[in-house]
Amino acid sequence: MPPLSITVVFPMFNEEAYVERAVNAARDVLGRTAHDFEIVVVDDASTDGTGPLADRLARADPRVRVVHNPVNLKLGGALRAGYAAATKDLVFYTDADLPIDLAELPRAVRLLEYQQADIVAAYRHDRTSEGWLRTVYTFAYNHLIRILFGLKVRDVNFAFKLFRRSVLHRFPLRSSGSFIDAEFLLRARKHGCPIIQIGLDYFPRTRGLSTLASFGVIAEMLREMAENWKDLR
């Protein structure tokens, strides 16, 4: 496997309870496995202490960078800002609450290189610990994406995407909301990027609130899905 050059992107909105833990965990794993890495924290106009905490971590370590969105751009805008800031060969995105064990990242990199893929998208072995409502919502969303677009990815919105940065040069991303994950995978498929999947253990958040299953987020996802249907199917 070639020397590992990787950017880790953490989109964050009001994640002061997690920001230091997330950065330290990424730095620990990458410090043992990567020859060249950076950690990009996207502060999506947080109203708590996320931004100042991230800035303090960046001042202490030049490998940590912070992108401050002047207004809240939601997940799509935060990820687009983080991806635009990435400079390394590979890009990895996950959530600040670390829904996965970051020690799995080197395995994903090995699979990416061994199978000569462009993207690794992970799926959760078991997500019932989140409760029945989120479980049903995710099941329905994944099947809707499969029916409308024919995308055979088991866990479209799971926050574990590893990919070659060169993929970002092949197409623009336009979504502002949580449809960004589906858009990324669909545009990648349309441009012939090989996608592989791996199963991971899942650790639901214990602090703060997830807004992914809120009515407003779901409505925005459905709107963007409808707008992009002809282009992405």
Describe each region flagged by the PLM.
Residues 152, 173-176, 185-203:
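Catalytic donor-sugar/metal-binding loop of nucleotide-sugar-dependent glycosyltransferases
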Residues 69-85, 90, 102-178, 204-224:
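Acceptor/aglycone-binding surface of glycosyltransferases and processive sugar-polymer synthases
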Residues 17-21, 48-57:
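Acidic helix N-cap motif at the loop->helix transition within catalytic regions
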Residues 5-7, 38, 183:
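Cell-envelope/extracellular polymer assembly enzymes that use nucleotide-activated donors
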Residues 43-52, 98:
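A conserved acidic beta->alpha catalytic loop
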Residues 1-28:
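N-proximal low-complexity "stem/linker" segments adjacent to membrane-targeting elements
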Residues 37-40, 51-85:
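Conserved donor nucleotide-binding strand/loop of the catalytic core
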